[in-house]
C-alpha cells in the first residue's frame, strides 16, 4: 500500500475515533511525505510535532499496523508535505491529489481558498493575557459564513474558515505554553505510576483538582532523573485543562534568581513582585539553588507568605528533604514542611518495564517483552537514563527499518552501556557496600553472629553477589567467611521471597543494586 492510498484511510479512522475538536485541530491540517523510503508526518512546528508524538502517534501507528504492517513506523518532523483528503467511506480512497501544501518540482502550488483571508502576522499575546483571552480576541476576527435562511440545508464550513479556526486554536495553544513554560509532553496521561511515585502522583492529581487547599506547599524531593519535573508540570497542564483561565507558571530556581537580580539592577522591584503574585499556581524546580543568597531567600519568604495567605498553590522540588538543605533560611525550611512533603524513589523493575512499553507505544514501535526486561535490568538508576536508552534503541529501530525492538537490537544499540555496566564487581565490593548501607561492620557480615540485624544484611549481600558476579555458590560461601554453599542457597531464597512480601526490603535491595553498579 502506498502512502497516497494509506493516508486518506488513516484520516477516516482517526476521524471516527477522536473527538471532533481534536481531529480538526491536530489531525486534519497534517501533511505527509516519504523520505528515503520512510513515511513522514509533518507538523507545523516542533511544538506541534511534540504534541503529535505524545498524544496521537500511538493511534496513527495502530492504524498503520492494521492497514500497512509491512511499512516502518512514521517519523514526525516539522515541515510541509502533501495533504490528502479523508476517504469519504472507509475503503473508498479519494484520488491522490496534492492539496494546499503540495510542492511540485521547482514551483510551489498556490493555495486556493474558497474565502479569502486577510494575511496578517500571528498575534503575539501580551504577557498579562491568558490563553482564553487570546483565543476569544482572535475568534472575533475570523471570517464567518453567511447565515442560512430558516429551513434551508446547512452547508459545510468552508475550507478557509475551518483552516482559520484550526490555526487560531493551535496558535492559542502554543501561546499558552509560551506563557506557562509547561511542556505539553508532561501530563498525567503520559505518566507511568509505580511504587516509587504512586503516592506523589495521587497527591498531584488532588492538587490539580483543588489547588491551594490541602497540600500547600507541595514539596517533592528525590535524586535527579526520577520524574519530579514530569509530575509537577502535569499538575499545571491538568489545571489548565480544567481551568483555561488559570495563571500558571513553571520555572527553574535559576530563572527566579535571575529575574530578581534583574529587578534589583533595573529598579523594577514592584513590577517583579506583581508579576509573581498574579499566578494561581507557581512551580519552582530545584529550589535548593536559592540557598546562601540572602536577598533572594528574603524575597522568596515574602512571596511564600503571599501564596499561603491567598490560598494560591506553590509546588517546589528539591534533591533532599527541606530540613537537610544546608545554607537555606530556617524560616523557609520550616514553611516548606507546612504542606505535604513526599519523596520519589527509583523506579522498580515493573515500573521501568511499563515506562519502556509506554515510550514504545507513543513512538509507534513494538517492543518485545524480553527486550523490555533486558533494558529495564540494564538501566536501574533513574527514569531519565532509561528514556535515554530507549531513545537510542528506538532510533536504531527506525534507521535499520526494524519495526519491532527485540533483544538483539537492544544489545547492539546499547553495547557501550553494557560494557560500562559489566565492570568487575567483586564480593568484597558488595560486602563493603552492604555494610555501609546497613551501618554494620564488615566483620559482622563475615562473622558468625545470627541476630536479625546482622543475618538479614548478610543474606542480602549473598543474593547481590549471586546476581552481580559470576561466582558459584561454593565460591560465594568462601567469600562470606567460609560458609557452606547450602547456607548461601538458603539466604538467596529467603531474600527472593522477602522481596515479594516486604516492600521495604525490596526497596533496599534495588537501592543497593544501583549503588553498587554506579
Swiss-Prot record:
Ranges for region Domain IV, binds dsDNA: 398-518
A Gene Ontology biological process term: regulation of DNA replication
Claim: Transport is one of the keywords in the record: no
Region: Domain I, interacts with DnaA modulators, residue numbers: 1-72
Region (Domain II): 72-180
Quaternary assembly: Oligomerizes as a right-handed, spiral filament on DNA at oriC.
Domain notes: Domain I is involved in oligomerization and binding regulators, domain II is flexibile and of varying length in different bacteria, domain III forms the AAA+ region, while domain IV binds dsDNA.
Record's protein name: Chromosomal replication initiator protein DnaA
Species whose genome carries this gene: Neisseria meningitidis serogroup B (strain ATCC BAA-335 / MC58)
